[in-house]
């Protein structure tokens, strides 16, 4: 639980959760689900996590569970080239240009922040776009997946005793030997060190592309020496090696090649990966054969961070997972992530790039475009090397056959007013026109006109909203918690939570309270809470309007807001309605008094009295 600002030791905000439950290591505080397709379910979940030290934190998760279906399949996608990064929405736009519509998506590979080049393999449309030795996730045409080490190896047979090991579409260093580039990388290599380059083209009519378990014959058609950024042919490949490489024999082998010479490029992979159509590299294996892994290599493994992971369950269904480390969500360590993926039923699970890279996107049924589902750690989504999407064929929408309510779930208190949006989709979940005869109703709610409902006073359990239109029906359920985790109190129209309150005697102050439940903002009205003040301070009504007692001296006490077993108490001081001895009857008296009690100015004290000198020249002492 966060500690609010304290202006002084005496001004302590007291927040009490009476009879608060003892939470396990991870306990689900609540969740809402939404079907994105026949076999794809989106779950927004809130967990209460207890660390090894006993600290309780909130965790907000976005989980997409997918079972194989004809209309939706997983794919890997990146920007126009491997070099550089791409925003999720721009990558989605590229998919749309290819005739696909995003159902949901998460970020994929770890990558070099300076170049955007992903670590590990990348496969799209059954074509190997980049090599690598990292663990990976691969998807087959039927929507199934494989996780593990793909053991992808690219070799070059140049007629020597031993074929050369090749790094495919990676940045050149003096340590990584022979490289092979295609225009998937970019139009140029953009390397920062000089190298020796050999231009090759496939023999016959073969395309300049590599596939798993493939052998490709190429012909030497040119050489380029002592160049950092060398052009990559559109219809071929570029072999390269650093001039200062530690692999001198490999450099000599490339330098020995002559025009017209025939070379063989061979790609091999582990059994079970031959038919993978999309893949991207990842990091540590989190769950293997149903058991949680504990030996991690990631440098931030023990840090609480935003995380992205993917897993395969015993029945073959897939789990796409993200958790936030922003706002009111603390993130997970890698060990906690492994335990969470196991708890979600994963037989095998793989860690993907996290932290500021963590991203979750979703197209809510009834909407024509996608939205960001998670809260990014950097305040906005980071451009990444690649993404994993669930996609369907894009097509014109038919007649509405499904109705949706948004928000599709959440938390509310009695008396709250909830604004809702009604959307419609056809049988393929494509956005469709909403029938015009929309009616709102439900359980523990009352239609409040237009697109609003009001939660009934005294409602318990859940408020269920129902929308009907054109013979279709949709529901959204809002849990009514018995207690809250925090109730910040603010001035009406202000955003800063109060840690104490000081007002003038006889003044009226409009206050508002907001309920929070494990980091989730709860729909509420001021009448959802019980307001009370110490008798000596004045009165407060059900809407949070505080009327202070008339007094010529400071009176102290407390103001308390309560919901269920949760209360928030502010220390309150009611002072004189005329704090300054020299402002009575002055034209600016009320303004000066208001600023004084707002803490904006303080005046000066003399002989036990407070003076403002309203007509004197302004000095710095007037302002705090």
Predicted regions and their residues:
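Edge beta-strands of extracellular beta-sandwich domains
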Residues: 472-482, 567-575
């Amino acid at each position: 639980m966060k500690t609010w600002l304290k202006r002084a030791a005496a001004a302590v905000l007291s927040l009490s959760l009476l009879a608060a439950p003892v939470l396990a290591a991870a306990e689900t505080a609540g969740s809402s689900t939404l079907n994105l397709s026949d076999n794809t379910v989106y779950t927004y979940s809130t967990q209460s996590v207890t660390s090894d030290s006993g600290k309780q934190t909130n965790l907000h998760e976005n989980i997409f569970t997918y079972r194989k279906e004809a209309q939706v399949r997983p794919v890997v996608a990146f920007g126009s080239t491997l070099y550089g990064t791409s925003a999720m929405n721009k990558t989605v736009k590229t998919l749309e240009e290819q005739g696909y519509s995003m159902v949901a998506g998460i970020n994929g590979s770890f990558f070099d922040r300076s170049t955007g080049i992903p670590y590990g393999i990348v496969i799209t449309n059954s074509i190997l776009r980049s090599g690598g030795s990292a663990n990976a996730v691969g998807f087959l045409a039927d929507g199934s997946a494989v996780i593990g080490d793909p053991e992808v190896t690219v070799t070059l047979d140049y007629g020597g005793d031993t074929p050369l090991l090749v790094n495919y579409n990676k940045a050149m260093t003096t340590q990584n030997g022979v490289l092979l580039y295609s225009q998937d990388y970019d139009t140029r290599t953009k390397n920062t060190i000089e190298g020796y380059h050999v231009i090759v083209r496939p023999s016959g009519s073969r395309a300049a592309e590599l596939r798993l378990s493939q052998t490709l014959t190429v012909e030497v058609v040119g050489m380029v020496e002592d160049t950092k950024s060398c052009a990559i042919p559109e219809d071929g490949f570029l072999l390269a090696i650093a001039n200062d490489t530690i692999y001198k024999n490999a450099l000599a082998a490339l330098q020995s090649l002559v025009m017209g010479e025939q070379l063989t490029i061979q790609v091999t992979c582990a059994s079970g990966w031959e038919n993978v159509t999309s893949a991207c590299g990842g990091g540590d294996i989190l769950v293997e054969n149903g058991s949680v892994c504990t030996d991690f290599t990631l440098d931030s493994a023990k840090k609480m961070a935003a995380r992205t992971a993917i897993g395969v369950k015993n029945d073959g269904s897939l789990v796409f997972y993200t958790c936030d480390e922003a706002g009111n969500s603390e993130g997970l360590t890698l060990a906690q992530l492994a335990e969470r993926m196991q708890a979600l039923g994963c037989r095998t699970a793989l860690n993907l790039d996290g932290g500021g890279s963590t991203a979750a996107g979703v197209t809510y049924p009834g909407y024509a475009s996608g939205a960001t589902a998670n809260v990014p750690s950097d305040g906005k989504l980071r451009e990444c090397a690649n993404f994993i999407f669930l996609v369907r064929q894009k097509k014109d929408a038919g007649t509405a056959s499904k109705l949706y309510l948004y928000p599709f779930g959440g938390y509310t208190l009695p008396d709250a007013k909830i604004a809702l949006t009604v959307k419609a989709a056809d049988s393929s979940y494509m956005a469709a026109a909403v029938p015009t005869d929309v009616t709102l109703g439900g359980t523990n709610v009352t239609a409040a006109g237009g697109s609003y409902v009001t939660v009934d006073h005294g409602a318990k359990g859940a408020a269920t909203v129902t929308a009907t239109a054109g013979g279709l029906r949709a529901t959204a359920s809002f849990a009514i918690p018995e207690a809250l985790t925090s109730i910040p109190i603010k001035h009406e129209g202000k955003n800063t939570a109060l840690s104490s309150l000081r007002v003038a005697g006889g003044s009226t102050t409009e206050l508002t309270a907001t309920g929070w439940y494990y980091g989730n903002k709860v729909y509420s009205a001021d009448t959802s809470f019980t307001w009370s003040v110490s008798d000596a301070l004045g009165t407060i009504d059900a809407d949070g309007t505080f009327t202070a007692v008339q007094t010529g001296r400071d009176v102290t006490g407390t103001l308390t807001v309560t919901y269920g077993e949760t209360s928030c108490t502010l220390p309150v001081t009611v002072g004189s309605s005329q704090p300054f001895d020299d402002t009575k009857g002055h034209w600016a008296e009320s303004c000066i008094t208001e600023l004084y009690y707002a803490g904006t100015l303080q005046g000066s004290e003399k002989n036990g009295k407070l003076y403002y000198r309203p007509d004197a020249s302004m000095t710095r002492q007037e302002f705090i």
